[in-house]
Amino acid sequence: MVRYKATISYDGTLFSGFQRQPNARSIQEEIEKTLLRLNSGTPVTVHGAGRTDAGVHAYGQVIHFDLPQERDPEKLRFGLDTQCPDDIDIVSIELVSEEFHARYSKHIKTYEFLVDAGRPKNPMMRNYAIHYPYPLSLALMQEAAMELVGTHDFTGFTASGTSVENKVRTITQASVSIDEKTGFYVFAFSGNGFLYKQVRNMVGTLLKIGNGRMPVSQVKTVLESRDRNLAGPTVAGNGLYLKEIRYE
């Protein structure tokens, strides 16, 4: 078998998430259906680097799959891209060794989260950013975001019900900025892995800090206490983007 690595992007609005689910539309299923046609009716399993949730978007999701023979990567990319639905784009495909695994090979993920703050809101962006109508302090959020950088136990920023036992992760970069063109707040996080709804919980906490309803020290309090109840709310997934995955 020959292994292929593909970088894909997608608009997550009409998907239940990346992972295949019964009676629901998923990115994995759509790509597997297309590969089934390209592979003469033989099923192909797609493995993703990240299992994005319903409504979450991606610019740089990475997948891998195996085919029984070697094909020209660009021709394969073109065939897969043109036969996938319009809300999925196959950015690139390359041949990789059998040891490569999209999820388990060592990598750094970067997520971005967009917030349309203030009034009036932009209804055209309702599927691509969350609206937050209250005043925000960029300086306070930037200061609090720096507290997330480093290796920590992120239990307090994880959604309940996760089956992952080891909740220690390393965040190498965390920032908050304002996009000059849109005026949206951009929350960016890079790290070696993220827990279930971790990014959305961190953004919810930073928004409360930016609005003055939590102190900057709340981030440290949540990390040390590992108490989810002390963090901010889970923001909606439509503002979240899997921006990039870099492999070592």
UniProtKB/Swiss-Prot annotation:
GO biological process: tRNA pseudouridine synthesis
Superkingdom classification of source: Bacteria
Catalytic machinery residues: 53 (nucleophile)
Key words, A-Z: Isomerase, tRNA processing
Catalytic activity: uridine(38/39/40) in tRNA = pseudouridine(38/39/40) in tRNA
InterPro entries given in the database record: PsdUridine_synth_cat_dom_sf, PsdUridine_synth_TruA, PsdUridine_synth_TruA_a/b_dom, PsdUridine_synth_TruA_C, TruA/RsuA/RluB/E/F_N
Name under which the protein is recorded: tRNA pseudouridine synthase A
Organism phylogeny: Bacteria, Bacillati, Bacillota, Bacilli, Lactobacillales
Gene: truA
